[in-house]
Amino acid sequence: MKKAIQFGAGNIGRGFIGAVLEKAGYHVVFADVNEQIVDRINRDKGYTVQIMDTVCEEVRITDISAVDSRNPELAQQIAEAEIVTTAVGLTILPRIAGAIATGIEARREQGVEQPLNVIACENGVRATSQLKAAVLTHLDAAGQTYCEQYVGFPDCSVDRIVPPVKSENPIDVVVERFFEWNVERAAFKGAVPEIPGMNPADNLIAYIERKLFTLNTGHAITAYLGRMKGYMTICQSISDEQIHAVVKAAMRESGRGLVARYGFDRDAHFAYIDKIIGRFTNPYLCDDVTRVGREPLRKLSAGDRLVKPVLTARQYGIGTPNLLLGIGAALHYDNPEDPQSVEMIAMTARLGAAAAVAEIAELPAGDPLPALAAQAYAEVERIIR
């Protein structure tokens, strides 16, 4: 029996990665700290993925079990697995690194020479590399040597909208039909597993940045502009003509940067942008703007979805007025229930928009972006409200 360990039994874990692995013939063990979800998976031994699109479909996922990720039993589960995946959020990766390291150590002690591949399926660049660095800190020299020989850590790019829709059954999940899972081919240990829906990629960074600069950029700007106008959901926000125009223009600006850097076909990429915007309008996937816009400090960092597209585009002399409006809107994201929003609003009030952006994105002195962002911060308030 092929076995996969999926850290994170949340909506993404169940509705995307876990479902893909189960359909590929793996017994999927969900590892999570949510005891209610763990108990429900073990009780029901299955859940339904509701694919909501112009044509709706229900898919049953049944070859599954679950374990509390703090349970020592997890180490043996990892010792018996061929693949470990995560969908827990970037900030949680260091917290699960110890459990993964313990599982790797169990494999070493048991003399397991079958390769294990660990893939962090998170919204971030090189998430698996970050996880690997954290895992290695929990291994001694012998464990690190074993890990380098038998454990692969391929980076990946994932794309599927899985909104937090409440169902009668708490482990059923709603998803869109579209998904992409691009995984770094060269980083696998052993043969690349044949998993329908997983694309082994030779130029992963291009796929990572295409997704980051398109879906993530557009999603975030839609959320921040929608919040400024009082909308509650992404589909409401993108249906506003003014927001739609800014978001599409911003995605085209980031797209021109991608075309210049990676040689994507311009027309094909612009068609991809239109497809992404079409996904935002899906009435079955009315994602909350507060969920999509959460953690604005992270989203405003130099390597993330708002600032990095601007930095990339300017390398090729491409103007980014609408991307800058997105940064300005992010600085207006005022959500008292989001600690990063509270910190950002206080920082902007204390330092001013330009200095706040410079500090958040850790930009060098003299970089022109903070001043441009400050202008956009004022302009977006004038034109959007």
Indicate where each model-derived feature is located.
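Substrate/ligand-engaging "lid" and interaction regions
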Residues: 1-5, 11-385
